[in-house]
């Protein structure tokens, strides 16, 4: 197995045989022991953005669209209990978006949290669908609404949501300039993008505007920008080396692997072992899942340190 020529079948087979550590001796997959401890909730810095948060974060976009998601559809008390449990366990990163409809819910949960400890990310939807079609105002108007919904003076990170075109840095230039101005004013601490195609990811690599990027990553190519993880990993390494913060999402293939314990562990070992993903977000639906992933992440970190 050498470099980018490694056969994908062998790659997946290595994971299945529990020999994923062999992949990390390859420069493409090698860990740089960047994580300072075995603590799954240790503080990490997102690239050169200056934003610090926990290695493990909570996503709120499970089965989400049109300002609706798992958290907004189930009993509110249960969702608040879930958010509070994440906080009590030490999670300090919460991932939101306009299309998830979770701003007001987190605002309620934050009544029992220390805002200064939190990293709140949310995202602006610019594509068709997702939100009412007439709601595409300038980014400063959108961010003002977000702050009111969240009941907060500032937002840590605001991203353009689900970019897929290779020219998004041109088509979104006006919104990007507004977000840059909001950052200069301290209304947001950073800006960036979540991408859902490899061309969009490569465009982000070339853009100095991107502070932090969400990337879809797992060792199985499920719900990713390419079915071959090697192609995605190469760009992720470049993003990291350029100083951009890298947040890993879809670690369990958009939930498709959530009932396969071995593949969950393989995914955690793989993503943490890359050395180029700053933190990971998981869309939790039960308190037990939070506890479970904290334990699994700790074990994965222990493997890396050994």
Where are these regions (language model features)?
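Active-site groove signature of glycoside hydrolases
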Residues: 150-166
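Beta/alpha (TIM)-barrel catalytic core signal, keyed to glycine-rich beta->alpha loops juxtaposed to Asp/Glu
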Residues: 9, 40, 163-306
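Active-site mouth loops of central-metabolism enzymes
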Residues: 63-76, 126-137, 258-259
């Amino acid at each position: 197995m050498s470099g980018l020529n490694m056969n994908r079948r062998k790659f997946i087979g290595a994971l299945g045989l529990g020999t994923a550590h062999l992949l990390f001796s390859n420069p493409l997959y090698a860990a740089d022991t960047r994580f300072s401890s075995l603590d799954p909730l240790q503080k990490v810095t997102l690239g050169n953005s200056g934003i610090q948060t926990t290695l493990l974060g909570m996503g709120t976009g499970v089965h989400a669209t049109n300002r609706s998601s798992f958290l907004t559809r189930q009993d509110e008390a249960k969702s608040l209990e879930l958010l509070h449990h994440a906080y009590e366990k030490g999670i300090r990163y919460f991932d939101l978006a306009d299309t998830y409809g979770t701003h007001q819910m987190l605002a309620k949960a934050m009544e029992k949290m220390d805002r200064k400890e939190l990293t709140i990310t949310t995202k602006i939807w610019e594509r068709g669908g997702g939100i009412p079609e007439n709601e595409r105002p300038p980014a400063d108007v959108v961010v003002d609404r977000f702050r009111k919904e969240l009941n907060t003076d500032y937002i840590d990170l605001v991203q353009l949501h689900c970019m897929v075109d290779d020219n998004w840095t041109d088509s979104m230039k006006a919104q990007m300039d507004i977000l840059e101005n909001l950052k200069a004013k301290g209304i947001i601490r950073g800006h960036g993008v979540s991408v859902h195609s490899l061309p969009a990811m490569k465009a982000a690599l070339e853009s100095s505007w991107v502070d932090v990027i969400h990337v879809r990553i797992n060792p199985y190519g499920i719900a990713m920008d390419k079915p071959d993880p090697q192609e995605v990993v190469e760009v992720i390494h470049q993003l990291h080396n350029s100083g951009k913060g890298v947040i890993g999402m879809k670690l369990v293939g958009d939930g498709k692997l959530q009932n396969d314990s071995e593949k969950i562990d393989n995914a955690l070992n793989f993503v943490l072992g890359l050395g180029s993903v700053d933190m990971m977000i998981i869309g939790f639906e039960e308190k037990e899942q939070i506890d479970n992933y904290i334990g699994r992440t700790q074990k994965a970190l222990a493997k890396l340190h050994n």
